[in-house]
């Protein structure tokens, strides 16, 4: 039980065993449906970082359970209490997609409102890795809900991605452990590739854009300067376009 794990942690030295125990405790707490019990356990965690992570994971799991039960409005209120901005963006986008899938005019309007909230939290000209992650989450949502806006948000960051890919290729020459490039060329693995290369982290978004509008996604791929990056983006766009699941259904423009 999480209570037993918590009691044992105090006996462990500062070592990988303690780190693993905190991870196990965090997972156990996130599965608890009793809010009072979870709060009691979290409050007893001595390590500040571990306590924060446990709280964030519990809050996220609680939102997921609430949304899965169909209580979307309750989930929406819970998202507003999150302190981690990226997690808040992710949950807003996920909830927006759930509303959108219901398909009624009222639900689509709610999805648009949630996406507007998520968009208000991002920097559309990302200055660091976290900014880019937030922007790409919003692009993920709009790729289904308002594809034209998703493309318009993605297009300005292609130049930044070109710079990042070129820089990664240069740095790979001086790191023998780097398996993302071979003789300066990006290795196009059938699996997801190396998450250290930012482009590989956002293949889902590229596939969703390809599903929404393959011609436009292919034109976007042409803006990537390196041939290997162009090939990767085009292949992922095609993969998205040939998916068997239903393509996103467009609706009126989102109020911005």
Task: Describe the residue ranges of each PLM region.
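Non-catalytic tandem-repeat scaffold regions and their flanking low-complexity/translocation tails
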Residues: 1-256
């Amino acid at each position: 039980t999480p209570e037993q794990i918590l009691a044992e942690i105090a006996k462990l030295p500062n070592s990988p065993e303690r780190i693993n125990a905190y991870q196990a405790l965090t997972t156990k707490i996130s599965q608890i449906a009793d809010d009072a019990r979870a709060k009691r356990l979290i409050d007893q965690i001595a390590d500040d970082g571990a306590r924060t992570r446990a709280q964030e994971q519990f809050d996220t799991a609680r939102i997921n359970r609430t949304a899965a039960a169909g209580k979307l409005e309750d989930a929406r209120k819970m998202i507003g209490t999150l302190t981690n901005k990226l997690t808040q963006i992710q949950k807003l986008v996920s909830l927006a997609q759930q509303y959108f899938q219901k398909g009624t005019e009222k639900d689509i309007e709610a999805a648009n409102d949630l996406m507007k909230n998520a968009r208000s939290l991002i920097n559309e000209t990302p200055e660091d890795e976290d900014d880019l992650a937030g922007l790409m989450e919003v692009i993920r949502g709009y790729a289904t809900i308002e594809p034209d806006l998703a493309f318009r948000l993605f297009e300005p960051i292609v130049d930044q991605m070109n710079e990042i890919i070129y820089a990664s290729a240069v740095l790979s020459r001086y790191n023998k452990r780097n398996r993302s490039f071979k003789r300066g060329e990006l290795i196009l693995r059938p699996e997801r590739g190396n998450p250290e290369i930012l482009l590989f982290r956002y293949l889902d978004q590229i596939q969703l854009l390809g599903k929404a509008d393959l011609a436009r996604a292919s034109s976007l791929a042409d803006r990537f300067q390196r041939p290997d990056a162009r090939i990767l983006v085009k292949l992922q766009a095609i993969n998205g376009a040939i998916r068997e699941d239903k393509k996103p259904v467009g609706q009126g423009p989102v109020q911005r």
